[in-house]
C-alpha cells in the first residue's frame, strides 16, 4: 500500500505511518511483539525496538517514556 511503499528504501516492508505507530504501545517484556511490526530489544525493553529482521530502529515506541 502507499504507506508501506513510500518508506521502503532498503528497509523491511512492514513500515507503519506515524499516525498508526502512535496508537501502539511497546510491551515492557523484552522480545514481546508490538503491533507496528517491531519487538523490544533484550537490553532496552523500555523503548528501543528492532524490526522483525533484527535491525535496530532509531525511535522509541510510543507510550513507554512515562509508564
UniProtKB/Swiss-Prot annotation:
One of its GO terms (cellular component) is extracellular region. Keywords: Disulfide bond, Neurotoxin, Secreted, Toxin. Expressed by the venom duct. Residues 1-21 form a propeptide. Contains 4 disulfide bonds. Its main location: secreted. The keyword Disulfide bond applies. One of its GO terms (molecular function) is toxin activity. It is found in: Secreted. The cysteine framework is XII (C-C-C-C-CC-C-C). This is Conotoxin Cal12.1p2. It comes from Californiconus californicus (California cone).
